[in-house]
Amino acid sequence: MSASSTEATNLAGKTCLITGGAGGLGRALAAAFLRAGANVAICDLNEERLKQASAELSGTGAGSLLAANADVADPAAAQQLFDRITAKFRTVDVLVNNAAIMDRFDPVADLDHELWDRVISVNLAGPFIFSKLALRVMLQQPKPDGCILNIASGAAKGGWLAGRCDLGLARICRG
Protein backbone atom coordinates (compact mmCIF):
# COMPACT_ATOMS: atom_id res chain seq x y z
CA MET A 1 0.00 0.00 0.00
CA SER A 2 1.36 3.37 -0.89
CA ALA A 3 0.91 6.34 1.43
CA SER A 4 -1.74 7.81 -0.87
CA SER A 5 -3.76 4.58 -0.99
CA THR A 6 -3.74 4.17 2.80
CA GLU A 7 -4.85 7.77 3.27
CA ALA A 8 -7.89 7.03 1.11
CA THR A 9 -8.59 3.72 2.84
CA ASN A 10 -10.47 3.76 6.12
CA LEU A 11 -10.21 0.45 7.92
CA ALA A 12 -11.50 1.70 11.28
CA GLY A 13 -13.16 -1.15 13.13
CA LYS A 14 -11.50 -3.81 10.97
CA THR A 15 -8.97 -6.31 12.31
CA CYS A 16 -5.99 -7.54 10.32
CA LEU A 17 -3.78 -10.51 11.25
CA ILE A 18 -0.34 -10.70 9.68
CA THR A 19 1.81 -13.80 10.09
CA GLY A 20 5.53 -13.13 9.97
CA GLY A 21 4.53 -9.60 10.93
CA ALA A 22 7.64 -8.62 12.86
CA GLY A 23 9.94 -7.96 9.95
CA GLY A 24 10.25 -6.86 6.35
CA LEU A 25 7.06 -6.86 4.34
CA GLY A 26 4.96 -8.04 7.30
CA ARG A 27 6.04 -5.09 9.44
CA ALA A 28 5.47 -2.65 6.56
CA LEU A 29 1.97 -4.04 6.01
CA ALA A 30 1.22 -3.82 9.73
CA ALA A 31 2.21 -0.14 9.73
CA ALA A 32 0.05 0.54 6.66
CA PHE A 33 -3.00 -1.18 8.16
CA LEU A 34 -2.52 0.70 11.44
CA ARG A 35 -2.28 4.02 9.55
CA ALA A 36 -5.52 3.11 7.79
CA GLY A 37 -7.18 2.77 11.22
CA ALA A 38 -7.32 -1.02 11.50
CA ASN A 39 -6.58 -3.04 14.59
CA VAL A 40 -3.59 -5.22 13.79
CA ALA A 41 -2.37 -8.51 15.22
CA ILE A 42 1.11 -9.62 14.23
CA CYS A 43 2.65 -12.97 15.03
CA ASP A 44 6.20 -14.10 14.58
CA LEU A 45 8.46 -16.85 15.87
CA ASN A 46 11.38 -14.48 16.47
CA GLU A 47 10.67 -13.03 19.92
CA GLU A 48 13.35 -10.31 19.77
CA ARG A 49 12.19 -9.06 16.38
CA LEU A 50 8.61 -9.18 17.65
CA LYS A 51 9.51 -6.91 20.59
CA GLN A 52 11.26 -4.46 18.25
CA ALA A 53 8.32 -4.42 15.84
CA SER A 54 5.85 -3.94 18.68
CA ALA A 55 7.81 -0.95 20.01
CA GLU A 56 8.10 0.54 16.52
CA LEU A 57 4.45 -0.01 15.57
CA SER A 58 2.81 1.01 18.86
CA GLY A 59 1.12 4.36 18.42
CA THR A 60 1.13 4.12 14.62
CA GLY A 61 -2.30 5.16 13.39
CA ALA A 62 -5.61 4.91 15.19
CA GLY A 63 -5.81 1.14 15.50
CA SER A 64 -4.62 -1.08 18.33
CA LEU A 65 -1.75 -3.56 18.07
CA LEU A 66 -1.51 -7.09 19.43
CA ALA A 67 1.90 -8.77 19.06
CA ALA A 68 2.19 -12.50 19.76
CA ASN A 69 4.87 -15.13 19.56
CA ALA A 70 3.44 -18.05 17.59
CA ASP A 71 4.59 -20.85 15.31
CA VAL A 72 2.29 -20.80 12.26
CA ALA A 73 2.87 -24.53 11.75
CA ASP A 74 1.39 -25.39 15.16
CA PRO A 75 -2.42 -25.74 14.99
CA ALA A 76 -2.81 -25.37 18.78
CA ALA A 77 -0.72 -22.17 18.82
CA ALA A 78 -2.76 -20.84 15.89
CA GLN A 79 -6.03 -21.53 17.70
CA GLN A 80 -4.73 -19.83 20.86
CA LEU A 81 -3.76 -16.80 18.79
CA PHE A 82 -7.19 -16.60 17.15
CA ASP A 83 -8.79 -16.91 20.60
CA ARG A 84 -6.68 -13.95 21.83
CA ILE A 85 -7.50 -11.88 18.76
CA THR A 86 -11.24 -12.51 18.90
CA ALA A 87 -11.28 -11.87 22.65
CA LYS A 88 -9.60 -8.50 22.10
CA PHE A 89 -11.00 -7.37 18.73
CA ARG A 90 -14.05 -9.68 18.29
CA THR A 91 -13.21 -10.67 14.70
CA VAL A 92 -10.62 -11.06 11.96
CA ASP A 93 -11.43 -9.22 8.74
CA VAL A 94 -8.12 -9.55 6.90
CA LEU A 95 -5.56 -12.35 7.11
CA VAL A 96 -2.15 -11.89 5.51
CA ASN A 97 -0.27 -15.20 5.30
CA ASN A 98 3.23 -13.76 5.14
CA ALA A 99 5.34 -16.08 7.33
CA ALA A 100 7.78 -18.23 5.37
CA ILE A 101 11.22 -19.77 5.59
CA MET A 102 13.75 -20.68 2.92
CA ASP A 103 15.53 -23.93 2.31
CA ARG A 104 19.23 -24.14 1.45
CA PHE A 105 18.66 -24.57 -2.31
CA ASP A 106 20.05 -28.09 -2.17
CA PRO A 107 19.40 -30.51 -5.03
CA VAL A 108 16.64 -32.99 -4.20
CA ALA A 109 19.15 -35.81 -3.69
CA ASP A 110 20.83 -33.77 -0.95
CA LEU A 111 17.76 -32.31 0.79
CA ASP A 112 17.61 -32.82 4.52
CA HIS A 113 14.30 -34.46 5.46
CA GLU A 114 13.85 -32.40 8.65
CA LEU A 115 14.35 -29.17 6.70
CA TRP A 116 11.87 -30.42 4.08
CA ASP A 117 9.26 -31.05 6.78
CA ARG A 118 9.82 -27.65 8.40
CA VAL A 119 9.60 -25.68 5.13
CA ILE A 120 6.41 -27.53 4.14
CA SER A 121 4.97 -26.97 7.64
CA VAL A 122 5.64 -23.22 7.70
CA ASN A 123 5.18 -22.28 4.04
CA LEU A 124 2.26 -24.51 3.09
CA ALA A 125 0.57 -25.99 6.17
CA GLY A 126 0.80 -22.68 8.08
CA PRO A 127 -1.28 -20.70 5.57
CA PHE A 128 -3.77 -23.59 5.40
CA ILE A 129 -4.15 -23.64 9.21
CA PHE A 130 -4.51 -19.86 9.47
CA SER A 131 -6.85 -19.58 6.47
CA LYS A 132 -9.12 -22.28 7.89
CA LEU A 133 -9.34 -20.51 11.26
CA ALA A 134 -9.81 -17.09 9.64
CA LEU A 135 -12.60 -18.36 7.40
CA ARG A 136 -14.43 -19.79 10.39
CA VAL A 137 -14.28 -16.39 12.13
CA MET A 138 -15.20 -14.46 8.97
CA LEU A 139 -18.20 -16.67 8.27
CA GLN A 140 -19.54 -16.20 11.83
CA GLN A 141 -19.90 -12.45 11.36
CA PRO A 142 -23.47 -11.11 11.02
CA LYS A 143 -22.58 -10.23 7.42
CA PRO A 144 -19.92 -12.78 6.39
CA ASP A 145 -17.03 -10.88 4.89
CA GLY A 146 -13.26 -10.87 4.83
CA CYS A 147 -10.09 -11.06 2.81
CA ILE A 148 -7.19 -13.51 2.83
CA LEU A 149 -3.91 -12.47 1.21
CA ASN A 150 -1.23 -15.09 0.60
CA ILE A 151 2.27 -13.72 0.08
CA ALA A 152 4.54 -15.79 -2.16
CA SER A 153 7.96 -15.11 -3.59
CA GLY A 154 9.56 -15.40 -6.97
CA ALA A 155 11.12 -18.63 -5.70
CA ALA A 156 8.18 -20.45 -7.28
CA LYS A 157 9.95 -20.05 -10.62
CA GLY A 158 13.08 -21.79 -9.33
CA GLY A 159 13.48 -25.43 -8.46
CA TRP A 160 13.77 -24.83 -4.72
CA LEU A 161 11.60 -26.30 -2.04
CA ALA A 162 10.30 -22.92 -0.85
CA GLY A 163 9.22 -22.21 -4.42
CA ARG A 164 7.29 -25.45 -4.60
CA CYS A 165 5.44 -24.38 -1.47
CA ASP A 166 4.54 -21.08 -3.18
CA LEU A 167 3.06 -23.04 -6.08
CA GLY A 168 1.14 -25.28 -3.68
CA LEU A 169 -0.20 -22.27 -1.79
CA ALA A 170 -1.42 -20.69 -5.03
CA ARG A 171 -3.27 -23.91 -5.92
CA ILE A 172 -4.84 -24.31 -2.46
CA CYS A 173 -6.40 -20.85 -2.80
CA ARG A 174 -8.23 -21.77 -5.99
CA GLY A 175 -10.29 -24.43 -4.24
From Swiss-Prot:
CDD domains: SDR_c. GO terms for molecular function: oxidoreductase activity, acting on the CH-OH group of donors, NAD or NADP as acceptor; quinone binding. Diterpenoid pyrones display various biological activities and FDDP C shows anti-cancer and anti-HIV activities. FDDP C also shows inhibitory activity of 42-mer-amyloid beta aggregation that is involved in the pathogenesis of Alzheimer's disease. One of its GO terms (biological process) is fatty acid biosynthetic process. NADP(+) binds at I18, D71, N98, K132. It comes from the Eukaryota. The keyword Isomerase does not apply. Its EC number is 1.1.1.-. Pathway: Secondary metabolite biosynthesis; terpenoid biosynthesis. It is an enzyme of class 1 (oxidoreductase). Keywords: NADP, Oxidoreductase. Short chain dehydrogenase/reductase; part of the gene cluster that mediates the biosynthesis of diterpenoid pyrones. The first step of the pathway is the synthesis of the alpha-pyrone moiety by the polyketide synthase dpmpA via condensation of one acetyl-CoA starter unit with 3 malonyl-CoA units and 2 methylations. The alpha-pyrone is then combined with geranylgeranyl pyrophosphate (GGPP) formed by the GGPP synthase dpmpD through the action of the prenyltransferase dpmpC to yield a linear alpha-pyrone diterpenoid. Belongs to the short-chain dehydrogenases/reductases (SDR) family. This is Short chain dehydrogenase/reductase dpmpG. It comes from Macrophomina phaseolina (strain MS6). The gene is dpmpG.
